[in-house]
Amino acid sequence: MLVHQGRKRLNGTVEVDETYIGGEEPGLAGGRAQGKNVLTGIAVEVREPKGIGRCRMALLEDGSAASLLPFVSDHVAPAATVITDAWMGYHGLAKLGYAHRRRSQRAARARGEDPAALLPAVHRVASLAKRWLLSTHQGAVEPAHLQSYLDEFVFRFNRRRSRSRGMVFYRVLELAAGHEPVRYRNITAGNKPRKTSPVPPATRGHPPSLDRVTAGRPWRAAHLPYSG
């Protein structure tokens, strides 16, 4: 709901990368191998000398060019300068009309530098988004609704410097009025726990030794119904 279909694409210098929402999967190659976590594309405007402009976030099918190039073209204006790492999924950006600058993580490691410093803006936004999901929502976000949560984060982040709360509220109402109605039961469909019948506790019997009478110990005899 918090995404305007006609919003302007990012321009100027834009950093683009991907991250896992849910943490990296151990044993998978790099940050592109698929697992149970959700791969998310992030694009962030870089403002000189040191600043961050707007951002965009969207779920990706995988880390291939078939997913990454449409993400960039949907969220970054033509003729913008796009900065990425050296992943081969971005190699077609120049053909789409972007000034593409690649920064190699392998070369950074060889120089003893931190690879995260190659794309500082996009990594900062990714860290803020994950912290927001873990703190505000306690990490209780279903994958089916993750894009809606990311849209909310982007809406808040892009208006973090707004001085008019009234205009922000007006924008929320405007977007809500132009969105199709969403019922609560549609949001929670498929997330309800299954109803199961309670299992009665197992009946404990007495030890077999209590069934026989021991001389001098009548209390060890088997219990008989009271006859009055």
Where are the regions that the model predicts?
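Residue-level recognition of single "structural anchor" positions
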Residues: 1-228
